[in-house]
Amino acid sequence: MEPESIGDVGNHAQDDSASIVSGPRRRSTSKTSSAKNIRNSSNISPASMIFRNLLILEDDLRRQAHEQKILKWQFTLFLASMAGVGAFTFYELYFTSDYVKGLHRVILQFTLSFISITVVLFHISGQYRRTIVIPRRFFTSTNKGIRQFNVKLVKVQSTWDEKYTDSVRFVSRTIAYCNIYCLKKFLWLKDDNAIVKFWKSVTIQSQPRIGAVDVKLVLNPRAFSAEIREGWEIYRDEFWAREGARRRKQAHELRPKSE
């Protein structure tokens, strides 16, 4: 009996914790639930339990990798913009043919000093290491930590077809959200309008891919046989296929309620 999604595992754990905290108020109910949990646990094979835990670990590491990637790009763009403005200011002050003077020169000098102090403080405070260095070493440090479990976190290299499909999905989804906003904001159309319904269906059909599309866990060939490694890949692919179908179905079912 496998959960439909990773969130269900946490829900089951919360239910178990709640039953423990509540205490033995009704003895018969506790015995019944305990017997039921024993039967459910006996029905789950050891391989399925291991694969389920790997799914939870993989999903958490995927979330962390995504957060670290966003953090790295945000502060990389920040430093790049600061460097660009600083270089332009330095050029205007010392390399232009016309001598800059007056208030313009004071503003340029203040800007250059402000950028220099900001960059120095950014390094001294450790923000450069936290936002640039550590995210770049995320995979190395993570794999050192999970090496004892004989698993490794690797990047998934998407094919050109997958990249093209992802780009089309992103553009379609962005256009659909913009059109829905404009139709409802400026034309005062309701949710039950046919045009609004069409663009909402576009947002549902153009949802991004889920699962092992960016990072994934691979098992160590020295510790796991080829059969177990193949079973893990199949288990994960089937899980995310069911999860994607469930999310699309849920989105379709929620549409009439919002309308």
From Swiss-Prot:
<keyword id="KW-0472">Membrane</keyword>
<comment type="subunit">
    <text>Component of the NEM1-SPO7 complex.</text>
</comment>
<comment type="function">
    <text>Regulatory component of the NEM1-SPO7 complex which acts as a phosphatase and dephosphorylates the phosphatidic acid phosphohydrolase PAH1. Essential for the formation of a spherical nucleus and meiotic division. The NEM1-SPOo7 protein phosphatase is required for efficient mitophagy under prolonged respiration, as well as for reticulophagy and pexophagy.</text>
</comment>
<keyword id="KW-0443">Lipid metabolism</keyword>
<dbReference type="GO" id="GO:0071071">
    <property type="term" value="P:regulation of phospholipid biosynthetic process"/>
</dbReference>
<keyword id="KW-0539">Nucleus</keyword>
<keyword id="KW-1133">Transmembrane helix</keyword>
<dbReference type="GO" id="GO:0005789">
    <property type="term" value="C:endoplasmic reticulum membrane"/>
</dbReference>
<feature type="topological domain" description="Extracellular">
    <location>
        <begin position="94"/>
        <end position="106"/>
    </location>
</feature>
<feature type="transmembrane region" description="Helical">
    <location>
        <begin position="73"/>
        <end position="93"/>
    </location>
</feature>
<protein>
    <recommendedName>
        <fullName>Sporulation-specific protein SPO7</fullName>
    </recommendedName>
</protein>
<dbReference type="GO" id="GO:0016020">
    <property type="term" value="C:membrane"/>
</dbReference>
<keyword id="KW-0749">Sporulation</keyword>
<keyword id="KW-0812">Transmembrane</keyword>
<keyword id="KW-0256">Endoplasmic reticulum</keyword>
<dbReference type="Pfam" id="PF03907">
    <property type="entry name" value="Spo7"/>
</dbReference>
<feature type="transmembrane region" description="Helical">
    <location>
        <begin position="107"/>
        <end position="127"/>
    </location>
</feature>
<dbReference type="GO" id="GO:0071072">
    <property type="term" value="P:negative regulation of phospholipid biosynthetic process"/>
</dbReference>
<feature type="region of interest" description="Disordered">
    <location>
        <begin position="1"/>
        <end position="40"/>
    </location>
</feature>
<dbReference type="GO" id="GO:0071595">
    <property type="term" value="C:Nem1-Spo7 phosphatase complex"/>
</dbReference>
<feature type="topological domain" description="Cytoplasmic">
    <location>
        <begin position="128"/>
        <end position="259"/>
    </location>
</feature>
<dbReference type="GO" id="GO:0061709">
    <property type="term" value="P:reticulophagy"/>
</dbReference>
<dbReference type="GO" id="GO:0030435">
    <property type="term" value="P:sporulation resulting in formation of a cellular spore"/>
</dbReference>
<dbReference type="InterPro" id="IPR005605">
    <property type="entry name" value="Spo7"/>
</dbReference>
<dbReference type="GO" id="GO:0031965">
    <property type="term" value="C:nuclear membrane"/>
</dbReference>
<dbReference type="GO" id="GO:0006629">
    <property type="term" value="P:lipid metabolic process"/>
</dbReference>
<dbReference type="GO" id="GO:0005783">
    <property type="term" value="C:endoplasmic reticulum"/>
</dbReference>
<dbReference type="GO" id="GO:0019888">
    <property type="term" value="F:protein phosphatase regulator activity"/>
</dbReference>
<feature type="topological domain" description="Cytoplasmic">
    <location>
        <begin position="1"/>
        <end position="72"/>
    </location>
</feature>
<dbReference type="GO" id="GO:0006998">
    <property type="term" value="P:nuclear envelope organization"/>
</dbReference>
